């Protein structure tokens, strides 16, 4: 066994926001993925190992199916769980999403792994956002994200868990939309957003 494999292990588990996907732009023309887990590893240095398991487009039901092989069988000390944005994109009920998240939280706890729930970030729509229909659509989507996030925060509070509020960290405080400083497509983070995520997690 090498020295590196003896270090405490943290698994970052989720979808494209865990994979570090971002839409190509001036700062990232070649679609380079910049996972927050890499930033977390930079801060941890030799005090721990970070493994990243993010699958683009994945919904929480799919995350549940691979949780054992990807997380439980690896026996990490901690798992950071971010999921639900794709479910919301398919208009899934926040309560249904939360049931899937709780399955993963509880499976981790039963295996003596510390789960770190993460709230889902907001979204942003620029073109036509001032149109009444678009404004109502956007408000509805943000409201559903906030509903899911309240469920996540309430669960963490009841179980005495620390959770990370990615929504608040990356949202414009006035509009509650995903801030332009951290996203260039209104859905995914940019390198700046992922770096903020990793730094604040640390």
Where are these regions (language model features)?
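Alpha-helical cap/lid subdomain in secreted, periplasmic
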Residues: 3-6, 38-46, 62-202
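Serine-esterase "nucleophile elbow" of acetyl-processing enzymes
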Residues: 1-56, 66-75
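Cell-envelope and extracellular/periplasmic
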Residues: 16-17, 53-58, 80-84, 88
């Amino acid at each position: 066994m090498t020295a590196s494999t003896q270090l405490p292990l943290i698994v970052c588990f989720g979808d494209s926001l865990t994979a570090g996907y971002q839409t190509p732009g001036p700062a990232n023309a070649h679609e380079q993925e910049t996972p927050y887990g890499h930033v977390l590893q930079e801060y941890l240095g030799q005090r721990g190992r970070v493994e990243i398991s993010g699958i683009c487009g994945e919904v929480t039901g799919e995350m549940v199916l691979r949780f054992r092989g990807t997380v439980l069988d690896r026996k990490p000390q901690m798992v950071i769980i971010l999921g639900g944005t794709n479910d919301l994109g398919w208009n899934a009920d926040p309560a249904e999403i939360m049931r899937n998240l709780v399955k993963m939280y509880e499976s981790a706890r039963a295996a003596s792994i510390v789960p770190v729930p993460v709230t889902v970030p907001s979204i942003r729509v620029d073109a036509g956002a001032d149109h009444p229909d678009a404004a109502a659509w956007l408000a509805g989507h943000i409201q559903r994200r906030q509903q899911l996030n309240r469920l996540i925060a309430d669960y963490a509070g009841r179980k005495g868990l620390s959770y990370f509020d990615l929504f608040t960290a990356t949202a414009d405080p006035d509009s509650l939309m995903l801030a332009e400083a951290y996203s260039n497509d209104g859905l995914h983070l940019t390198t700046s957003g992922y770096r903020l995520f990793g730094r604040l997690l640390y």
